[in-house]
């Protein structure tokens, strides 16, 4: 006779599976938000160290200034995250090429643009349910799972934040205050993480 699995066991295993899936999706959403917040903070820690002039200064004619990178990121954020689940990520009113010229002329206006872009990011991701993470969205008509779309933007923003940090460090030279592990301080950092004095996340 074929083995029969008690209904109670089936139900228990189903609940365990569903619980694990829910924990995974919640963890993914929260981890993604933490990564986005980390890169936002990293860029802001770099930008606060440069002068207003340096904020708008490119290294050469083909390079982007920090201000241009910020304008591009903000434009991308508005396009990708507005109506994230219900509309294409490349909005018809977006003019991507214009994001690389004529940034706002003052730091305050630039940071308002920056903050609005990040508001779009967090407002789209924070309410996502576990069911939402299984959905499909499009970018330029190309299908992406919600997780793929989030991962894509994490990688994109990390790339540009790295550029911002590099430019700021270049301009500040010896006055630069490290935003990661200071040179020759790896052992100290490792010990502080192990003793829970600080977190590396």
Language-model segment annotations:
Residues 8-9:
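Basic polycationic patches enriched in arginine
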Residues 36, 40, 47, 114, ...:
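Hydrophobic alpha-helical core bundles mediating ligand binding, dimerization, or RNAP-core interactions
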Residues 101-137, 144-159, 163, 201:
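Acidic/histidine-rich alpha-helical segments that form the ligand environment
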